[in-house]
C-alpha cells in the first residue's frame, strides 16, 4: 500500500469513526444496546441527549476536527512542528463554532491561556465522578504519527511540542 493510501485511510478512518461515534459518546456498551437496539454499525443522527445533538448524521465532532486542523497545519509547515504551528491549528479550529462548542475544559482553558486571557475553569475543580476525563491531546495528535512513520522518538517529541 502506498504512503498516500495509508495516510488517506488513517484520515478517513478517524473521520468515519468520529461521525459514527457522535451518537453514542459517553454511553456504555450496555446503554448503546438499549438505546439503539444493538451495536451501532452505521452512521446515525445523534440523539437529543448527547453532545452532538442537533447535528446531521455523518458530521464530525471535535474528536476529528482537532486532528484535521492539526494535520492541515503540519502540511502547511511542511512537517516542521513548533509551538506556533500548534497554536495556529488550535486557534483556527476554535474559530469554527460548530467544532468549538465541543471544546472540553482543558482545551478551552489552553486556548484562553494562549490568548493571554484568564483561564479560570470551575469545572477543573470538580472531582470527576463519571469515570471520564478530557482527552483533547489524544484526539488531535494522530497526524504526528503520519508525518513520523517509524520514528517514535520524533513522534513523541512532536507530540509534546503540540500538546
Give the role of each language-model region:
Residues 1-163:
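Structured, active/binding-site neighborhoods that engage oxygen-rich ligands
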